[in-house]
Curated annotation (Swiss-Prot):
One of its GO terms (molecular function) is manganese ion binding. Catalyzes the conversion of D-ribulose 5-phosphate to formate and 3,4-dihydroxy-2-butanone 4-phosphate. Its EC number is 4.1.99.12. It comes from Nitratidesulfovibrio vulgaris (strain ATCC 29579 / DSM 644 / CCUG 34227 / NCIMB 8303 / VKM B-1760 / Hildenborough) (Desulfovibrio vulgaris). It catalyses: D-ribulose 5-phosphate = (2S)-2-hydroxy-3-oxobutyl phosphate + formate + H(+). The gene is ribB. This is 3,4-dihydroxy-2-butanone 4-phosphate synthase. Keywords: Lyase, Magnesium, Manganese, Metal-binding, Riboflavin biosynthesis. The keyword Transferase does not apply.
Length: 214
């Protein structure tokens, strides 16, 4: 990881704290993973404060595969089966079947419809009947131990929400360049500067949790 690019966002702990503060106020954060892993950066928002404008940004600036990160208990409550019985993904990404809100959407693909689907899935009264499949939102099941168990964006998202005191549900999408290639740290930092966001890394979050015994 190119640390000098990250220094403008503070120390390891400061970057995490800034990210948590941003999430608490309904803003997004950018999270980069290890250079020897996916070497990608994700735009992340809290599911409970997500707006259609923020969803539109994710659709416009990112890969378009908008994912809803959920802890295991929420996946079970919604009755969502995993996308495949035998996961052969190189990173072990835990996709469930895709979802759509059962009510309040049209085709399900617009920013507003996708937000409606997210809100339906995280509602306190949510149940399997609140959703339809397939759909245009892709849930991801986080490992119970968070980033201390798996250093993925899914776990980082759920960990950040919990540390921020929010519901443990977040939405992510991989940031891409205008030509469709994946954004790396330099492009991630540039995007953050242009959009007044902060950048942190999965490694920062691991260190933060370990140092604080969380």
């Amino acid at each position: 990881m190119n640390q000098h690019l990250l220094e403008q966002f503070g120390t390891t702990h400061e970057r995490v704290e800034r990210g948590l503060a941003a999430l608490r106020t309904g803003q997004g954060v950018l999270v980069a993973d290890d250079a020897d892993r996916e070497n990608e950066g994700d735009l992340i928002f809290a599911a409970e404060t997500l707006t259609p404008a923020q969803m539109a940004m994710m659709i416009r600036e990112c890969s378009g595969i908008v994912c809803l990160c959920l802890p295991e208990e929420r996946v079970s409550r919604l009755g969502l089966p995993m996308m495949v019985a035998h996961n052969t993904s190189s990173m072990g990404t835990a996709f469930t079947i895709s979802i759509e809100a059962a009510e309040g959407v049209t085709t399900g693909v617009s920013a507003a419809d996708r937000v409606r689907t997210v809100k339906a899935a995280i509602d306190d009264a949510a149940c399997p009947g609140c959703l339809r499949s397939p759909g245009h939102v892709f849930p991801l099941r986080a490992s119970p131990g968070g980033v201390l168990e798996r250093r993925g964006h899914t776990e980082a998202t759920v960990d950040l929400m919990r540390l921020a005191g929010l519901k443990p549900y977040g939405v992510l999408c991989e940031l891409t360049n205008p030509d469709g290639t994946m954004a790396r740290l330099p492009q991630l930092v540039d995007f953050a500067q242009r959009n007044r966001m902060t950048v942190l890394t999965v490694e920062d979050l691991v260190a933060y949790r370990q140092d604080k015994g969380l």
